[in-house]
């Protein structure tokens, strides 16, 4: 989000002169395992992880019901996500022999593929219209794969990259931090859960019971940050059904736990072993630090995830610029 601090305000941007930056259509750059070194040294990696950690700090100790500023750009992003939600209602699952991967998802995705730039154009001011094709790629990448009808942390990362790009061009600002997580990302999660349930999407690259979650990772990071220094909720409480039911509307982490228990049967320790182990960690700050390390190791440093990440002018593959 620090990138956003250097941007000119977007409030009067409809009258501002067009930007002179050369935007490009993002493309894949990580083709083999040795290419992963390029990614870890890249400006894109530094900006992406910096964005995640800035938001992590911004929501620390705050409930979802915390009062925060909601800018016009935030409202427009929520409206965009509401449109995606409405399209799910308009595209019911079809009857098919296979239980998983309902083919109606491809119809839904084709609509997004066709309309993505128009949707992004409703969020981006006219003087930044040249950025729309580049930014829209990340939106299209963030909702799952239409060939495999699956969804995973790589798609979630594309949505975070989409938001990061909007910060870099100044559409989202430093004072939007809390709303980015609580209003936009939370709405995105709701829509993704609806997609997963409606079309019975497969988890992309799931590690089964040994993974943190079949589909998401970021809400566990930001959700654990929300719970740091909570007066009475400790990590051991998230495996307590009563504590989850009473507090899930205030905390993303607990909402994730509720969704898992709705979708899976059997003892929690068996279907979500990694989370069960985390419940034994003594403090939320330790949980938060551990999840950040795990996210880097299990998502950002894994070739099967990052091979699909796309790089453009806003999240470039070139090495981090050294500041002299």
From Swiss-Prot:
GO terms for biological process: mitotic spindle organization. It comes from Bos taurus. The gene is PTPA. ATP binds at residues 148, 153-154, 304, 307-308. The modification N-acetylalanine is found at residue 2. It is found in: Cytoplasm; Nucleus. Signal peptide: none annotated. GO terms for cellular component: cytoplasm; nucleus; protein phosphatase type 2A complex. Its EC number is 5.2.1.8. Belongs to the PTPA-type PPIase family. PPIases accelerate the folding of proteins. It catalyzes the cis-trans isomerization of proline imidic peptide bonds in oligopeptides. Acts as a regulatory subunit for serine/threonine-protein phosphatase 2A (PP2A). Modulates PP2A activity or substrate specificity, probably by inducing a conformational change in the catalytic subunit, a proposed direct target of the PPIase. Can reactivate inactive phosphatase PP2A-phosphatase methylesterase complexes (PP2A(i)) in presence of ATP and Mg(2+). This is Serine/threonine-protein phosphatase 2A activator.
